């Protein structure tokens, strides 16, 4: 089954961008490459049970099994040793990426309290967007009774855009609610 946003991209966004930005080739039109969901575990690195809970929650949210990220070197100030677990991440591509973005735009972000839109200044110079969420409860898959602690996550949307303007225009076409 083709995802709704993927269909929107191929049928509406590509022709619009091809005309508006006057590309010479249809493959120059920016597209989504991947979405990376990352969650640092902080003080929970000593507790394997909490690590498994984070991994399970992220897998439920993303629809794909996550990977435990480990430290590359020891840092005494943070009480981190080499190869110690420091986070959990998931990289989404293809249909799962479009499905997650659809749920993020239409289900999760509207459930944020006092939501005014997301900050359009969080783009890097290559047109990639990074977003920080403060709680996992905004996703309908997460049940309030089953979580032990409210924690946030970082979401990075990687595009093939050449600059910030193209990236912003692409994500606006997908329906991400940016602040005015």
UniProtKB/Swiss-Prot annotation:
One of its GO terms (molecular function) is structural constituent of ribosome. The keyword NADP does not apply. GO terms for biological process: translation. Keywords: Chloroplast, Plastid, Ribonucleoprotein, Ribosomal protein, RNA-binding, rRNA-binding. One of its GO terms (cellular component) is chloroplast. It is found in: Plastid, Chloroplast. This is Large ribosomal subunit protein uL5c. It comes from Tetradesmus obliquus. The lineage of its organism: Eukaryota, Viridiplantae, Chlorophyta, core chlorophytes, Chlorophyceae.
